[in-house]
C-alpha cells in the first residue's frame, strides 16, 4: 500500500491517494465524516476551523460504495479561500518559514505554509478513516486520545476499550480522564489569555492486531520503522515512543509469558505489542510527543528577512493547541500503518480472499509440519 | 541514497550496500575501524564481543580508496562460528522469538535471532562511519553519547563539541559526564550481579548541517520522517524525540530568532534543528530511548512452544546493556540520514561538483532575484 | 521525482501528482492545453473524445503560476458521465476484462475498464506537458510521432527538428511523412469499414539532453530501466526499443566517435543516446510498439463468464486506433523520464540554483583535477 | 520483494541481496550452479569466462538449506584478479566509457567498466536461479532461448516445453532450432575472424503462471512495467516486446476466447499472457533485442579524451556475442519479475501458508458471492 498526500492549505482540495487497496471492500463513509468532524471540533481550536466543513469526496477506486482495486482518491475541499495577503518576510519560530526560505528561496513566507501547515493532516485523517473499513474486516480497532496537555497529565485511563472510547468522546479535549480534562481546559483558557500555545502527549492503541504482522526482511518493513516513518511526517509530532517510556530495567520492562486456558498471554505490555519489528498479538500502542503550535498570540522575537532587522512575529489568529486534533490524526496514522503491514502480510486481490487467507492461518503449533523437510 | 543491510549473526558476513554515493570521494577506512572498535569496546559488553574483531572489507564501489559512483559494499565477517545448538522452543520476552515464530513458522527459535539480533548493527555502524568521509567534505560532524543508563542520568554535558567528544571518549560507557559515568558503571555492576539488564537513553547531534536540507514535497522525504524510519529499524530503539522533550509551552519551547553580526541565530535549540521537515541551520539533535536487552541473566517466565507448558527462559551469556553501543549505532544512523538528505539536495555525480554546488549556494538574500518573474 | 496517477475513466477526475518538482519554476499552462488537445484530436478517434474538452486544473504546488516545491496536483475532469450500464460479463480479448476478473473477482467487467482504459493517459499527458516547462529551462525538447500504422510505414522523416515538428503537426495522424500520412488515413478508413482496429509504431526523441544523465548505481536508476518502467505502464504499449532496431553487427551498429571543431561527435546514433544506462549527449530516441485497440467494431469470439457459454464481444463505439494519440502520450512519458533523471542528477531546491549547477558543470576535461588525490 | 545487486567486475565478489523471500523454502543450489554454468559455457565466449568458475555462496537468509524470511545474500567470487592496467582514456563506442566519464569525471575509463560490464549479470542469474526454487512450488517454469543471431533467425521452435528445453540445451548457442544453430555458429566464426561482434534476439517464456498476477493499482506494479524495469537494466538489452511483434491488425492480433471442456482457452497468445498489466493464464512471453558487444576485435574510431586527438579503440580480448548468455540472464530476469509479482499477490510469511493461499484460490465463478453486498 502506498499513501500519497498533496494539496495546499488554501488550494482547492487536499488530496489523498491510496494505492494497493484490495477490491470488494465496502467503504463506510460515515467513519470518514466522523473522524473529520472530530479533528475539527475540540476545545481550543480557532476560527479557521469553523469555516471548513470538511466535506470530502471519493473520486476514484470506489464503485457503488465498493473498492475496485484501483487507486482510491479522496478530495477534501478547502473552504477558506486564499485571501489576498501582503508578502510576509518575518519567520515564525517553530514553523517551516525560515528553513523553507533557505531551501526554496521564494521571497514570500506565505508560500511555505501552504504545504507545511497542519491542514494536510485532514487528508491523512480521511485516509486513515477510510482504512478503518478495512481493519474492521479483521476486527482491528484503533483509538487515540490525549494523555498530556501543557502540564496536566491524565491519570485514570480505563483499560476497557469501549469505556475508554466513550470517556474520550465525552471529553472536549479527547482525554478519557474527566478530571484531567478539566485541568486541560483550564490550561487552554489560560494559554489563550496569555497568547501562549500548548504542547502535550497523545497515546494511540491498535487492538486486535494479530501476531505476525511486520517483517524482519527489509529493515524498513519493520513495523516500528513504518510507525516512525509516518508519525514523524505529521507536522506537530516531535517524538514517538512505542510502548512504555519506563524502560530502565529488564526485570520490570520485559513482558513475561504466561498461559491462560492453554493460550499464551502476557502479564504486561511494556513493549507496545511489537518485538523485533513484528507484532506479538498484544495491543500495539504508541506515545506521541506533540509540540506547541508555532503561531503564538503574543509576538516572538524574529528577524525581517527583507531588511535583516530585528522584528516581531505577526499576530495571526490561530488555535491554542494541536494536541487534541493530533490525537485524531495519530489514530488515523496508526490505521494507515497497520493496514499497510497487514496488506503486505496478506497480499492483494479481493478482500474476501484476504479474509479467507487470514482465517485459515491461526497461530502455528510447533508440530504443524512447517519446515518438515529440514534435517538438522 | 539507499542502504540495504543483510546478514545473519552467525553467517559468514554482515553486509551493507550503499547505492547512490557520488564518485571521487576518498574513503577514510580508519574511521570505520574506529567506530567498529567503539561499538565493541565499552563497559558492560559480554564475551561474544571479544570474539569478534570486526575486521571489514569494502568489496565494491571503491577503487584505490576512491568511490566510483557504483554501489559500495561493506562486508563485516562474523568471527563467532555457528555452534551446534539444540532446538530452542522457549521464547524470550522482548526478543523477536515469539512474534517471528508466529509469522515464519519455523520450529526453532534460534533461526530468528540470526536476523534480529543486534549483530546487524555492525553493518549499520560501518555504513555510517563510511559516510562520515562524505559528511566531512561538507564540514558536518556527528556525535552520539549516553545520557541515561538505568536510573542514572547525565547532568553536565559540555556545550563545546570537542570537549564533548573528548569526555565521551574518556568514558567507559560513552557518557560525557564523568560523575554519571561512575554511577552508570555501578548500575552495570549491580545489574550483572542481579542478572538484570539495563535500558537508557542516547543523544545524537549533527553539527554543521546547513539550513535547507530535507523536503516538504514527499511526506517521507521530510527529515523527521527519515530519522523515524531508520532509527526505529534499530533493534533496541523504542523511542525517538527530535530536540527537547520539554515541549509543553510555546513561549518556553519555540526557538526565537536574533541577529548576531548581521547573521541569524537562535537563542535556544529546542526544536532540534528541524522545522517543517527541513533543517534550519542549528544542530540536529535526537534523543533515543533504548530498551534493556531481552536476554537476562536470571530466567524469566515463558512458555515452551513445543509442549505448551510453562517454562523459564534459558540462561545465555549476554551483555548487560546495549545503551553504550547503541550510542555508536545511533551516531552512525544519523550520519546515514543526514548523508541521504544532503545527497537528495545536491544531486549526484562527482563529489567535487557536489562541493561546488554546495559552495555556490549560500543562504539566500530576500532580493536575490529568485522568483523574479512572478507578478503578484 | 515521483509520479502518481489515479482516477477512473467515468469518475469525476483523472489525477496526476508530481512530487519533487523544484520551486520557482514558471508553469506554462498553454503547453498542457496544447498536448491535451493533440491527444484528443487526430484522425481515427471515436465519438467519446469529442465529449471531453480536457480542461484541467492545477490544484496544488503552484502559486501565481510558479511552483512552490510542494507536490503538484493536476486534475483533469471527465466530461463523459457514467451512463447506467448493464452488467457486462463477456470479456474482450486484449482488454483487462478477464485477467482483472480473475484477480479482483467483482462480477461486472465494466468495473475494470474504469482504471485500465486509456483514459488515464490524459493525466500522464498533462504531467509530461507540465514538465516541459522544466525541460525548457535546460533547452531539452521532446518530440513524438507515428512511424507505422497497420501496414503503412513512414519513410521520409526529416532530420531537422523544427521541420519534423511542423510536418508532424500538419499530419492528421502525427506522421511527419505526408505520403505515409495518406496511406495511414486509408488504413483507418478501411479498418473502420471492416470493424477492425490498427496497431503501429511510434518514435519519440529527446533532443538536447546533456551527457551524464542516468546512473549506474542502483540498477533501476539506469535511464533505460526508467524508460522501460514508465513506457510499459502505458496500456497500449507492448514493445520498446531504445535506438535502432537493427543491431545485428557491431561494425554497423556501434556509434563511432569523431571530432568536430575540437568537440566530440558521433557519426551515427544507433544506440539511442544511452550507453550503460547514462546519456552520451546524443538524442535519446525510443521506438514504441502500440497494439491495436481491443474494442473491435465486429464481434470477436469470447465466453460469457456468467453462463460459461460461448458468446460474442459486444459492439461498443470506439476509436479505430490508439497509435496517433499514443505518440502524444509517449512524448509525455519521455518528458517525465528525462525530467526525473535530470532532477536526480541536479538535486532539489530552487530552479535557479539547479540551472546554475547545470551551467557550472560543462563536460569535464581529462586534467580537470577530479580524483586528484588518487595515487595509482 | 526487492533485488539489490552490487559488485565490481574485478572486485572480490558480485553480490545479490533478495529481500522479502518467504520462510521455509527449500533452496536447490543445483539449479543455481547449473544456470551459472550455462551462462558461462556457450559458443562464442572468450577467454575470461574460463577463468571464472562461478562458484557461489549463500551467506545469509538460508539455514540448513531452508530460507528464514531474512534477506538472502548470494556472493559470487570474481576469479579474475584485477591486473595492473594502464590508465585508459579512449572510450569504446557502445560502452559506458564516455557517458560515465562525463558524469563521474574520474580520469580512467577502466573504472567504469567495473560496474557496467556484463559481469554483474552473474548475480542476476544466481538470484533468478534461486527463485526458481520458489516458482517450482507453484509449478511455474521459465525458459529462455536464442531466436536470432546476426542475420540468422530460428524458424522451427517446438511448442512442447520439454522438447523445447531439450533442443535448446543441445545447442551450443541455446537455440532450439538445430539448423539455425549451425548458421549461428558460422556467424560467430565469421565475426570472430572479422573482429566483428553480433547482436540478436532472445525469447523468454514463463509457463504455468496463474491468471491474476500483477496489478492495476500502482502503475509500476503492472507486470509489463516490472518487466520493462528489470529487463532494461540488463546491459546488453536494447529492446523488449511482450508477446508477438506483429500487432498491426486487431483481428489478427487479439487472442479470442474459446471453451475447452468447460474451461476458458485462447486460440492464440499474441498478447504474451498479459492483459492490462495482469496475467491472463496463458504463457508470459517476451522478446528481447540484444545489442552486439561493444568490444570489437578490430579498432573503431574514437577520441583520446586525454589529448582530444583522434584515436582507435584498443584491442581487448572479448567475446564475440552476448546473445546466448543473455538468454540465460533474461530467463533469470523473468524468474525474478514473476516471483516478485507472485509474492505481491500472495503476501509474506511461510511458504506453506503461501501455497495454501494459492491453492484455495482457484478461478472465480461469476456467482461466487464476491461483492455480494453490492446493490446497483
UniProtKB/Swiss-Prot annotation, chains A, B, C, D:
Q: Which reaction does it catalyse?
A: 5-O-(1-carboxyvinyl)-3-phosphoshikimate = chorismate + phosphate
Q: Which GO terms describe its cellular component?
A: cytosol
InterPro entries according to UniProt: Chorismate_synth, Chorismate_synth_AroC_sf, Chorismate_synthase_CS
Its pathway is: Metabolic intermediate biosynthesis; chorismate biosynthesis; chorismate from D-erythrose 4-phosphate and phosphoenolpyruvate: step 7/7
Record: residues binding FMN: 115-117, 276, 291-295, 317
The enzyme's first-digit EC class, named in words, is lyase
Signal sequence range: none
Q: Cofactor stoichiometry and binding? A: Reduced FMN (FMNH(2)).
- Keywords per UniProt: Amino-acid biosynthesis, Aromatic amino acid biosynthesis, FAD, Flavoprotein, FMN, Lyase, NADP
Identify the residues that bind NADP(+).
39, 45
Is NADP tagged as a keyword? yes
Q: Which GO terms describe its molecular function?
A: chorismate synthase activity; FMN binding
Q: So what EC number does this one have?
A: 4.2.3.5
Lyase as UniProt keyword: yes
* Record text on subunit structure and interactions: Homotetramer.
Q: What does this protein do?
A: This reaction introduces a second double bond into the aromatic ring system.
UniProt xrefs under PANTHER family: CHORISMATE SYNTHASE (PTHR21085:SF0)
Q: What is this protein called?
A: Chorismate synthase
Task: Show the taxonomic lineage.
Answer: Bacteria, Thermotogati, Thermotogota, Thermotogae, Thermotogales
Amino acid at each position: 500500500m502506498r499513501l500519497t498526500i498533496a494539496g495546499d492549505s488554501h488550494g482547492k482540495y487536499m488530496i489523498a491517494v491510496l494505492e494497493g487497496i484490495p477490491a470488494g471492500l465496502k467503504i463506510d463513509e460515515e467513519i470518514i465524516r466522523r473522524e473529520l468532524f472530530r479533528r475539527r471540533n475540540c476545545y481550543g481550536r480557532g476560527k479557521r476551523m469553523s469555516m471548513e466543513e470538511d466535506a470530502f469526496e471519493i473520486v476514484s477506486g470506489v464503485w457503488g460504495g465498493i473498492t475496485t482495486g484501483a487507486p482510491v482518491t479522496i478530495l477534501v475541499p478547502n473552504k477558506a479561500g486564499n485571501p489576498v495577503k501582503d508578502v510576509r518576510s518575518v519567520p515564525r519560530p517553530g514553523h517551516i518559514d525560515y528553513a523553507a526560505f533557505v531551501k526554496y528561496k521564494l521571497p514570500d513566507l506565505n508560500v511555505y505554509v501552504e504545504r507545511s501547515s497542519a491542514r494536510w493532516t485532514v487528508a491523512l485523517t480521511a485516509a486513515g478513516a477510510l482504512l478503518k473499513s478495512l481493519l474492521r474486516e479483521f476486527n482491528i480497532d484503533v483509538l487515540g486520545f490525549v494523555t498530556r496537555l501543557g502540564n496536566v497529565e491524565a491519570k485514570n485511563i480505563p483499560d476497557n476499550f469501549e469505556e475508554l472510547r466513550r470517556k474520550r468522546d465525552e471529553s472536549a479535549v479527547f482525554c478519557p480522564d474527566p478530571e484531567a480534562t478539566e485541568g486541560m481546559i483550564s490550561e487552554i483558557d489560560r494559554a489563550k489569555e496569555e497568547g501562549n500555545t500548548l504542547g502535550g502527549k497523545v497515546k494511540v492503541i491498535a487492538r486486535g492486531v494479530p501476531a505476525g504482522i511486520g517483517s524482519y526482511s527489509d529493515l524498513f518493513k519493520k513495523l516500528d520503522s513504518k510507525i516512525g516513518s509516518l508519525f514523524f511526517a505529521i507536522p506537530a509530532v516531535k517524538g514517538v515512543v512505542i510502548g512504555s517510556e519506563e524502560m530502565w530495567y529488564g526485570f520490570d520492562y520485559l513482558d513475561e509469558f504466561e498461559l491462560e486456558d492453554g493460550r499464551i498471554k502476557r502479564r504486561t505490555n511494556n513493549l507496545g505489542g511489537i518485538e523485533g519489528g513484528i507484532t506479538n498479538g498484544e495491543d500495539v500502542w504508541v506515545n506521541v510527543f506533540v509540540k506547541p503550535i508555532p503561531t503564538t498570540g503574543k509576538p516572538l522575537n524574529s528577524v525581517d528577512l527583507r531588511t535583516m532587522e530585528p522584528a516581531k512575529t505577526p499576530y495571526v489568529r490561530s488555535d491554542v493547541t494541536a494536541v487534541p486534533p493530533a490525537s485524531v490524526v495519530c489514530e488515523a496514522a496508526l490505521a494507515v500503518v497497520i493496514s499497510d503491514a497487514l496488506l503486505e502480510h496478506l497480499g492483494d486481490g479481493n478482500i474476501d480472499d484476504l479474509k479467507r487467507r487470514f482465517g485459515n492461518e491461526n497461530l502455528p503449533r510447533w508440530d504443524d509440519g512447517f519446515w518438515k523437510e529440514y534435517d538438522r
